[in-house]
Amino acid sequence: MSQMANAITKRERDCLVFIEEYTGKGFPIRLHEIASTMKVKSPTAFNVIKRLEEKGLVESRNGMVKLTTVGKEAARKILIVHRTFESLFCQSGIPMEKACEEASDIDFLIPENNARKVLKRIDNPKVCPHGKPIWGR
């Protein structure tokens, strides 16, 4: 995913990550579930999904949404960066929930290769503070 061509917003990031975590169970997600989880109205969620669809990151059909191959890769990269920086923040003494919140504010802005450098500096943890795997190592 080229950073300039497919730059995403924080709201789009939140939506991508939620869809990845939900659909990892193998099922598409309903638009109203996305709206409810993101605490936005359905038209707002619809607009976010449309933007993600235009960027080739999701497919939407009959109110059901799933990630495309490109969307899965984008979400995977975001989660690698997120879990890396969450680990760094916790190792630096920031409480876990605050570390997660802070990582969510920047994880979609940092290239994966930079996160991998940070990962090496913090001794390559296998999982984030929540116990979720830091993929792709």
Predicted regions and their residues:
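C-terminal regulatory/oligomerization modules of transcriptional regulators
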Residues: S104-R137
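Basic amphipathic alpha-helical segments that dock to polyanions
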Residues: I34, A45-K55
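A short, conserved structural fragment
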Residues: E53-G63
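Short acidic, hydrophobic short linear motifs in intrinsically disordered regions
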Residues: K25-A35
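Short alpha-helical segments that sit at the start of domains
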Residues: M1-V17
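Pre-recognition alpha-helix immediately N-terminal to the DNA-recognition helix
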Residues: R13-E21, E73, T84
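Basic, amphipathic "hinge/linker" alpha-helix immediately C-terminal to the N-terminal HTH DNA-binding motif
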Residues: G63-V81
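Short coil turns linking two alpha-helices in DNA-binding domains
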Residues: K41-S42
